[in-house]
Amino acid sequence: MADSVHFPWMPFPPRFLVCTRDDIYEDENGRQWVVAKVETSRSPYGSRIETCITVHLQHMTTIPQEPTPQQPINNNSLPTMWRLESMNTYTGTDGTYWRLLDHSQMGDTLQLILDIVICEVD
């Protein structure tokens, strides 16, 4: 498991993210985060099936008025709000726990990567 790394010039991860539109979340400072990518994978684990959902969020200084058509994103599995519980765990409004895999900056873009593993009985 990757732990989040904080550099002196990096702000801390958002304390909470609230969904304001299908693909946009807003944090406690009014910064907007775009859902850039949602990855889903399934794998058998004993008598269970595990589903892993990984969400890539990027802080954008300007938000497009319409969702980008080139990459449709299914956000049905994402909570309407995440709250930071510890340095590497967010809790969703649906009671789910999401790991903070990455909080980094590349150029002017801040990025958050969160994931969750859901076990289903076969």
Curated annotation (Swiss-Prot):
<protein>
    <recommendedName>
        <fullName>Protein TCL1B3</fullName>
    </recommendedName>
</protein>
<dbReference type="GO" id="GO:0043539">
    <property type="term" value="F:protein serine/threonine kinase activator activity"/>
</dbReference>
<dbReference type="InterPro" id="IPR036672">
    <property type="entry name" value="TCL1_MTCP1_sf"/>
</dbReference>
<dbReference type="InterPro" id="IPR004832">
    <property type="entry name" value="TCL1_MTCP1"/>
</dbReference>
<dbReference type="Pfam" id="PF01840">
    <property type="entry name" value="TCL1_MTCP1"/>
</dbReference>
<comment type="similarity">
    <text>Belongs to the TCL1 family.</text>
</comment>
